[in-house]
Amino acid sequence: MMMQKLRRSGEFIRFGCKSLISSRPNKDSVSRSVSGFVNHYKSKGKLFELSDGNYKTELHHPCISRNVGMLLQQYKCFGSSAASLIQRNPLFSSLDSKDVSYFKEILGEKNVVEDKERLETANTDWMHKYKGSSKLMLLPKNTQEVSQILEYCDSRRLAVVPQGGNTGLVGGSVPVFDEVIVNVGLMNKILSFDEVSGVLVCEAGCILENLATFLDTKGFIMPLDLGAKGSCHIGGNVSTNAGGLRLIRYGSLHGTVLGLEAVTANGNVLDMLGTLRKDNTGYDLKHLFIGSEGSLGIVTKVSILTQPKLSSVNLAFIACKDYLSCQKLLVEAKRNLGEILSAFEFLDNNSMDLVLNHLDGVRNPVSSSENFYILIETTGSDETNDREKLEAFLLKSLEKGLVSDGVIAQDINQASSFWRIREGITEALQKAGAVYKYDLSLPVEEIYNIVNDLRGRLGDLANVMGYGHLGDGNLHLNISAAEYNDKLLGLIEPYVYEWTSKHRGSISAEHGLGVMKANEIFYSKSPETVALMASIKKLLDPKGILNPYKVLPHSLFSN
């Protein structure tokens, strides 16, 4: 009765606190969620730690102030743990033979996968870090079949995990327990392409590289380019709001996705597949599904604005002595290259050494070894003018001491070898051993400070490296070690999240939260904001069957 009253009152922060402190078996999850709560309000000057270890609060919101004492007691009690414990939601049903028979009726035998070998692959994430125990993978061929699957699963309270190319890095695309896998790989048709507007409409299972190949024949390019383009699906890209190499030029998917079709938990099909660049009729609901990681609905079709393929593409590989030079170079590139600047990527010397040591056929394009390397890509319509512009920029940067060495690719093969270095870092990390990956968004001037701080903190325990999309403030922080161990993880987390929050950053720039960072959301979002997100989740997925244990703190849904 008390819980119903709290839900009706809309005082979700109070409800959230109640959930947090009632889930004692998940004490590490509780600690993380409460830790984020504490850090958020300490940073806003509303919460003060006293010399005796207690806290004084100046929170006046009635939903928070009544429960802050209990919250803080839990925080002090549990401390900060490196591991997250998740319990299977007991309200979810378990799969039985009748369920399997139903799915075979609507999908056909071959599209209901029970084979252990195929399930082993589908249950395991790309980094082999997260592994579920699903006994069933479904392969729908169209939106109607997705609708039938979800309507049935919702009625039976069978949890579902949407899956595409399974290239995610935060455990978002694999089961946590025995969730039914719904893989959209067979939904891979290109439905239409308008060469006047450049609008492409396709199904969610289309592989990004295949879309790029198709568009190339039409004289267009995708606004999105990723290292995983050979495997990732456009539906997964949209569901995680993937960023990639071209964001500095073409912006995020919130800007380039014009419309989408999605199926909600109860099987309802939401047709928002517009192709218009302007539509001011009410709430633009597609944005709820972009970046929601399949927790609000399964994206089945996408309408995306593509760009004309320009004739002039140039790529420079540059060496810089320090991070300050990299920052200044970015400012100069924006001023001097302007509209033709299409990528500005960076990697440190540790990343370069890793690639050289673990990938065959890769070499450093510049003669001198430096602390940092930059890839600058320009895209325009005048080959001669664009190249002269890039050469003049590099010469000027060399004279200013911002660049110590550099080379411009002379042909497509050399350009590919440059990109191989940047895109091969993740592959090299896998070959090197255990890796702890963090995808952070920070003010550009702060990006490398966390790398240096973490090196000092970890010492010889691990190899810390930083690379990423400097043009949009996205750092890929990677810690490479011989093996995974709790001591190392305890030194990394929650330190990385606390550092990022302190410097007004985001703990997820483009990879999403998944299961890895669901409990860490408070480091980047206020409790009020998370409460509203949870309300939206409950509205669209009342039984919580869609990608459970992901995106939002597990404790909010434990009841």
Curated annotation (Swiss-Prot):
**Transit peptide as recorded in UniProt:** 1-78
Quote the disruption phenotype from the UniProt entry.
No visible phenotype when grown under standard conditions.
InterPro entries with a match to the protein in the record: FAD-bd_oxidored_4_C, FAD-bd_PCMH, FAD-bd_PCMH-like_sf, FAD-bd_PCMH_sub1, FAD-bd_PCMH_sub2, FAD-linked_Oxase-like_C, FAD-oxidored/transferase_4, Oxid_FAD_bind_N
The Gene Ontology biological process annotation of the record reads: alternative respiration; photorespiration
Q: How does activity depend on pH?
A: Optimum pH is 8.5-9.5.
| Keywords for the protein's UniProt record, in alphabetical order | FAD, Flavoprotein, Mitochondrion, Oxidoreductase, Transit peptide
Q: Which reaction does it catalyse?
A: (R)-2-hydroxyglutarate + A = 2-oxoglutarate + AH2
User: Which note does the record give on the cofactor?
Assistant: Binds 1 FAD per monomer.
Its localization reads: Mitochondrion
Cofactor(s) required, per the database record: FAD
The record's top EC class is oxidoreductase
Q: Name one GO molecular function term.
A: 2-hydroxyglutarate dehydrogenase activity
Tell whether Magnesium is among the UniProt keywords: no
Please name one Pfam family that this protein belongs to. Answer: FAD_binding_4
Annotated FAD-binding PCMH-type domain ranges read 130-309
- Induction field: By dark-induced senescence.
Q: One GO CC term of this entry? A: mitochondrion
- SUPFAM superfamilies recorded for this chain? FAD-binding/transporter-associated domain-like (SSF56176), FAD-linked oxidases, C-terminal domain (SSF55103)
Q: What is its main location?
A: mitochondrion
**According to the UniProt entry, what is the EC number of this protein?**
1.1.99.39
Q: State the similarity comment.
A: Belongs to the FAD-binding oxidoreductase/transferase type 4 family.
- Quaternary structure? Homodimer.
Query: In UniProt terms, what function does this protein have?
Result: Catalyzes the oxidation of (R)-2-hydroxyglutarate to 2-oxoglutarate. May be involved in the catabolism of propionyl-CoA derived from beta-oxidation. Involved in degradation of lysine for the supply of carbon and electrons to the ETF/ETFQO complex during dark-induced sugar starvation.
Q: What is this protein identified as? A: D-2-hydroxyglutarate dehydrogenase, mitochondrial
From which source organism is this entry? Arabidopsis thaliana (Mouse-ear cress)
Task: Identify the coding gene.
Answer: D2HGDH
